[in-house]
Amino acid sequence: ARARAQEAAVHGEVPVGCVIVRNGEIVGRGRNQREEKQAAVSHAEMEAIAQANAALGSWRLDECDLYVTLEPCCHFGKQPPCVNAILEAGISRVVVGSADPNPLVSGKGIAALRVQGVAVTEGVLREECDALNRIFFHFITTKRPFVSMKYAMTMDGKIATVTGASKWITREAARADVQQQRHRFSGIMVGVGTILADDPLLTCHMENGKNPVRIVCDTQLRTPLQAQVVATAKQIPTILATCCADPTRQAIYRQAGCRVICLDKRNGHIDLVQLMEKLGQEQIDSILLEGGGTLNWAALESGVVQQVQAYIAPKLFGGQEAKTPVEGAGVPVPSAAFRLKNSRLTHLGEDILIESEVEYPCSLEL
């Protein structure tokens, strides 16, 4: 079930997986496929039940056990609840990994099964299942996007040479993995400095990839009208987040196809907490932050980053003035450092990827 959930995540779905077992043999497998199939009923449980029905030649699954990574839904939304399908199929035992924090579910799915006599075992591999759903859990509980700060750097901590050149730090395998991340995340965010320096398109380059919503933090609306993100704004959703209240200036970008969100200023920058609230209201549940050192520091200082993804190449750039991933004012003493936890290391050819969760002091937690 976890493997199916991971497969769902790769395809940009909410990572839920399900298997149905009869007499020790898997007879049905399913994962969330709503986006892929554009079908409201394509929840993991529904897919697994349909496959088991076909395999056994029966709509009744009385002698079967169902294993699912996330508590089955019990509310009517765009489809009937998965709990209803489980009961209708006559499944006698359900094993659940994670409880669903969604207030519409939150234990109600498990309770509904038990009331009807289904044996339910909770919390099996809970930590592993929770990790699969970090983005979903964060968004459903905070109403703000899950933000992953991603950068590529050399082993001496440089994201560019002293001349500002950065193509390419990592090799093909690492860059291909970045495209997978762009496919999975709802939004991608950079600062205007990145636009001015690199003029990136900020799209997903993989075949059949899904382009994230592009978000540019531009305090004074300095993004050139000929920049690629503006030139393609009518084809790919693009948001300019700014503190510039000039209606004439805003209208120029809107006419080009951009959405302009005017925000307050905080510590000399766009109020990123306010921006996250606005983006959450638009159902943007996750953001890949590909900013430079200034924006990355502002995001950490604001407490909006949940994860760091560092792609590290076995190279040394040197250079006192060469850019680093996190700049800004910095912390005064080592004890004030932003701490990272639950780190995971992945080899990508000669490069490595380190993914860590950010641990904030209580005063910074959103």
Question: Can you say where each PLM-predicted feature lies in the sequence?
Answer:
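Residue-level signal for inorganic ion chemistry
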Residues: A1, G17, A48, C73, ...
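Short gly/pro/ser/thr-enriched loop/turn and capping motifs at secondary-structure boundaries
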Residues: P101-L104, E127-E128, L196, R222-P224, ...
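Conserved histidine-centered catalytic loops in small-molecule metabolism enzymes
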Residues: A245, E327-L366
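Active-site ligand-binding patch in enzyme domains
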Residues: H138-R144, S148-M155, I159-D285, T294-W297, ...
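Short beta-strand scaffold segments in enzyme catalytic cores
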Residues: V16-G24, Y151-A152, I354
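Zn2+-dependent cytidine deaminase-like catalytic core
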Residues: G28-E128, V213, I239, C244, ...
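Flexible, gly/pro- and Lys/Arg-enriched active-site loops
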Residues: E301-L340
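Short, basic/aromatic recognition patches
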Residues: A1-H11, F139
